[in-house]
Amino acid sequence: MEKVYVAGAIPEVGLKLLQEHFEVEMYEGKGLVDKDTLIKGVKNATALISLLSTNVDKDVIDAGKDLKIIANYGAGFNNIDIEYAREKSIDVTNTPKASTNATADLTIGLVLAVARRIVEGDQLSRTTGFDGWAPLFFRGREVSGKTIGIIGLGEIGSAVARRARAFDMDVLYTGPNRKEEKEREIGAKYVDLDTLLKNADFITINAAYNPKMHHLIDTEQFKMMKSTAYLINASRGPIVHEQALVQALKDNEIEGAALDVYEFEPDITDDLKSLNNVVLTPHIGNATFEARDMMSKIVANAAISAVQGEKPQFVVN
């Protein structure tokens, strides 16, 4: 029986599928698997189930001399050297569609949380309390009827747009390619990035990360935004220059931000933690029972297909 190495605990539904076809070795330590353990684990393995937090570099790929597939448990795959994997004839797959609804739900949740100051209100209610309802007390911003600007109208961005339309929001989007069919379906308008930044009340980042996207949102971009704008990032941390965001929040160049991802993840800078006008969540975009179970099935089936000589779903290289 061929061996699969699983770089961290995954839901039981996928693990059971793997156990029917492989000898399964899984990292069960606390925290992230370290490089030495990962290199040892992939030796003699024909499949690797990696997590978004698993750094699969050339050293790891070279150690996995028998690898046929690296099935990444997540929609992103910037944790893997996919070009080198291609050179070694190793398929790399991801789990794109499984994350769509969960991440779109969270994106809209972050919009509401930061605009209506829900987290601040919860903290106040649990600590000092409040003196009762008052006309000027704890005002936030309404979402309905505002303009949302979506950076990246892929599967997740489109799902965010549909949810935004339910709030009667106008939808702007930007990306490398115009998507006219999606425009008609959703009622979205394609604009360039600068136009989006200048006109949107809520700016959501739902694009995949690649080196060209690094610090897409920096000091210059924050200066373009409305002083009442909010930035929401549920994609990848390095798309936003985090220190520039901190400065924009401190200088009231924008009204607030909500982040599920961070530039130096898992570290969150103390400056961000100290600000009241930012909502922080611990990279939980697709952290639902439904999405994580589906992702578990997808990576298991991809590994099974690869060792059976079939082309797996969702190959990214």
From Swiss-Prot:
Q: Which residues form the active site?
A: 236, 265, 283 (proton donor)
What the entry lists under CDD domains is as follows: 2-Hacid_dh_13
What EC number(s) are associated with this protein in UniProt?
Answer: 1.1.1.-
Binding residue positions for NAD(+): 155-156, 234-236, 260, 283-286
Which keywords label this protein? NAD, Oxidoreductase
User: Keyword NAD on this protein?
Assistant: yes
The answer to whether keyword ATP-binding applies is: no
Pfam families, A to Z: 2-Hacid_dh, 2-Hacid_dh_C
List the InterPro entries hit by this protein, alphabetically: D-2-hydroxyacid_DH, D-isomer_2_OHA_DH_cat_dom, D-isomer_DH_NAD-bd, NAD(P)-bd_dom_sf
- GO function terms (MF aspect): NAD binding; oxidoreductase activity, acting on the CH-OH group of donors, NAD or NADP as acceptor
Catalytic EC class: oxidoreductase
Family membership, please give it. Belongs to the D-isomer specific 2-hydroxyacid dehydrogenase family.
- Protein name per UniProt: Putative 2-hydroxyacid dehydrogenase SAOUHSC_02577
Which organism does this sequence originate in?
A: Staphylococcus aureus (strain NCTC 8325 / PS 47)
The lineage is: Bacteria, Bacillati, Bacillota, Bacilli, Bacillales
